[in-house]
Regions:
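Positively charged, low-complexity intrinsically disordered leader regions
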Residues: 1-34, 204-212
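Structural signal for hydrophobic packing residues in well-ordered secondary-structure cores
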Residues: 3-10, 29, 33, 87-90, ...
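Generic secondary-structure boundary signal with a strong preference for alpha-helix termini
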Residues: 10, 23, 54-56, 136-138, ...
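Nucleotide and nucleotide-moiety/phosphate-recognizing core
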Residues: 26-122, 130-152
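YjeF_N-associated NAD(P)HX repair module
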Residues: 115-212
Length: 212
């Protein structure tokens, strides 16, 4: 992938691309009328993007609740960097796992319903198997919340290449995808809301090398 080339071959730290992605995504959020946010965080880089957006939303003075799904992604250094920053800032970080209590589930549902906007950072372009368990539950809660949903890169649950729904998927009102339009978004564009493509400052060299 283009971003992998930029990171591994050119040496751009992935956290820089995540920061670029977060700031690019925020350009498409109404920061005046949306005051309360719930960010749904999955286990990979898409989740890390969600944590990065959380940090910036806090800097704008907004209230942000974070729901971490499936436990902490401790093997992902960028993810953990953002997590520790938010922890030190005193952000309400709710962790939902398969063995979470009904009380935790109800808390998550209430946080979503109280929000002006839900940010979907559960799964990105790497998803290739059906959504199950706590992730399926969280997506269903978001879809049934009557709150607008903003998806980072691609709505969670959609295969970025085929457009196939892998079990269940987020019904996104807005999608900001990075660097290139994803084929899976093309195939679902009639079912989704607004779709925007934003560059995240990946060098032309990386694009040319990968796509030549």
């Amino acid at each position: 992938e283009v971003d992998a080339y930029a990171i591994k071959r050119i040496g751009i730290p992935s956290i820089i691309l995540m920061e670029n992605a977060a700031l690019a995504a925020l350009k498409h959020i109404d920061l005046v009328n949306n005051i309360k946010y719930t960010v749904l965080v999955g286990p990979g880089n898409n989740g890390a993007d969600g944590l990065a957006m959380t940090r910036h939303l806090l800097n704008y003075g907004h209230h942000v609740d974070v729901i971490i799904l499936g436990g902490l992604s401790e093997s992902n250094p960028e993810y953990m960097t953002y997590y520790r920053i938010l922890e030190r800032l005193g952000v309400d970080l709710t962790i939902l796992k398969e063995d979470s209590t009904l009380e935790d589930m109800e808390k998550a549902k209430l946080l979503m319903k109280r929000s002006d906007l839900i940010i979907d950072g559960i799964f990105g372009t790497g998803l290739n198997s059906p959504v199950r368990g706590i992730f399926e539950y969280a997506i269903d809660m978001a879809n049934n919340s009557d709150v607008r949903i903003f998806s980072i890169d691609i709505p969670s649950g959609i295969d970025s290449t085929t457009g196939k729904v892998l079990g269940t998927s987020v019904n996104a009102d807005t999608v900001v995808t990075f660097q290139f339009m994803k084929e899976g978004l093309y195939k679902n564009r009639d079912l989704l809301g607004e779709i925007f493509v934003e560059p995240i400052s990946i060098p032309k060299l990386a694009i040319d090398k990968v796509l030549k």
